[in-house]
Regions:
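Membrane-interface helix-boundary motifs at transmembrane edges
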Residues: 24-34, 119
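Individual transmembrane alpha-helix segments
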Residues: 6, 82-117
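Hydrophobic, membrane-inserted alpha-helices
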Residues: 15-23, 42
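Extracytosolic (periplasmic/ER-lumenal) interhelical loops and adjacent juxtamembrane/interface segments
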Residues: 52-95
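Structural signal for membrane-spanning alpha-helices in multi-pass inner-membrane proteins
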Residues: 24, 47-51, 110-114
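Cytoplasmic juxtamembrane regions at transmembrane-helix boundaries
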Residues: 35-38, 106-127
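Hydrophobic transmembrane alpha-helical segments in integral membrane proteins
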Residues: 1-17
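Aromatic-anchored segments of alpha-helical transmembrane domains
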Residues: 11, 41-50
C-alpha cells in the first residue's frame, strides 16, 4: 500500500505545484488557481505559525509514507522534486527561497489577472 501512496502523493503534490505555477495562463482556470495558491499560502504561513514556516500537510503525510519505505528525504518537497526530475541537489535555503519567490510571483500575477478579468466581465455585463 505504501509504494502506491508514495506514487499517488508524488503525482498529486507535483500536479498541485504545477497548477499553482501555471494555472493563471488560462482564463477559465484562474479562479481555481487563485484558490489553490491561497490554500498553499494559508498552509505555509497560517499552519506554518504552529508547525514551522512553509508547513505543508501533503509533504508531512508524504514524508510519513516515505519514512516507512526507508527513504531519507530532504526537509523540502521542492528539493526532492528537483532532485528526482533533474538530478540537481539544491541546498535547503535555496529551495525555500525559490519556492517563496515563485509563490509570491504567481500570487501577485493571479490577483492582478483575476481583478482584470472581473473588471472586464463587469464592463461587458453593464453594456
Amino acid at each position: 500500500m505504501d509504494p502506491m501512496l508514495d506514487r499517488l502523493f508524488f503525482v498529486f503534490h507535483t500536479a498541485w505545484i504545477a497548477f499553482n505555477c501555471l494555472g493563471w495562463i488560462w482564463r477559465r482556470t484562474r479562479p481555481w488557481q487563485l484558490a489553490t495558491v491561497s490554500l498553499t499560502a494559508l498552509s505555509w504561513f497560517g499552519l506554518g505559525a504552529w508547525y514551522g514556516w512553509g508547513y505543508c500537510p501533503c509533504t508531512d503525510w508524504h514524508w510519513q509514507v516515505r519514512a516507512r519505505l526507508g527513504h531519507d528525504d530532504p526537509p523540502s518537497y521542492i528539493q526532492l522534486l528537483i532532485r528526482e526530475v533533474t538530478g540537481i541537489d539544491l541546498r535547503p535555503g535555496l529551495a525555500d527561497a525559490l519556492a517563496v519567490v515563485i509563490l509570491a510571483g504567481v500570487t501577485l500575477l493571479s490577483v492582478v489577472l483575476f481583478a482584470r478579468d472581473r473588471r472586464a466581465t463587469r464592463a461587458t455585463l453593464s453594456c
